[in-house]
Amino acid sequence: MRDIKTYLSVAPVISTLWFGSLAGLLIEINRLFPDALVFPFFSF
């Protein structure tokens, strides 16, 4: 049981949480402030 707790507390869980939060942050930034490539398509 201690080995399972050690495994779950190291790299897989930490990297999953980090990349998940980073992806969510990038999605929200691109939703609120879209980059310049999409401006000509929405400025009719």
From Swiss-Prot:
The chain crosses the membrane at residues 7-27. Its main location: plastid. It is a single-pass membrane protein. Disulfide bonds: none annotated. Keywords: Chloroplast, Membrane, Photosynthesis, Photosystem I, Plastid, Thylakoid, Transmembrane, Transmembrane helix. The keyword Plastid applies. It holds the Pfam family PSI_PsaJ. It is found in: Plastid, Chloroplast thylakoid membrane. One of its GO terms (cellular component) is photosystem I. SUPFAM superfamilies: Subunit IX of photosystem I reaction centre, PsaJ (SSF81544). InterPro entries: PSI_PsaJ, PSI_PsaJ_sf. GO terms for biological process: photosynthesis. Belongs to the PsaJ family. May help in the organization of the PsaE and PsaF subunits. This is Photosystem I reaction center subunit IX.
